[in-house]
Amino acid sequence: MKKTLIITAAAALTACSNVPAPQLQSMQSYQVEWIGERPLIDSSMLTLTLLDSNRASGMAGCNTWTAEYQLKDDHFSLDSIATTRKLCAPALMEQEQRFLAALADVQRWEFAEHQQLLLWPAQGAPIKLWPTEQSDQH
């Protein structure tokens, strides 16, 4: 009986280790929930979409943004971030600047519980994002 239980437990553990880890997917969009230690301003929309050809884009709250990204294993970084230049309310503009600065500082990614994407800077708390429906944005 003990031997059967041990074999069953070992088989179950082996099966769990064969589940592939979730990966970042191109053409997937994410909606930002937190920037570091702070939640978003109510009704503001910040997004990130990973496009083909190592491009990313999204909404920064007031302006749209685009960048090149590098992805290798759990390392992730955004380079050459560019935005449109609309003006919005001061609080929204401040949040947008924090978001863009946080994006520029991202060094790695991971999925937390329930497929929440965490983009980690060199120091401090991550940007927290949730997946949205598949996107056709370009």
Which functions belong to the PLM regions below?
Residues 1-14:
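Sec-dependent bacterial lipoprotein signal peptides
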Residues 16-138:
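Lipid interaction determinants
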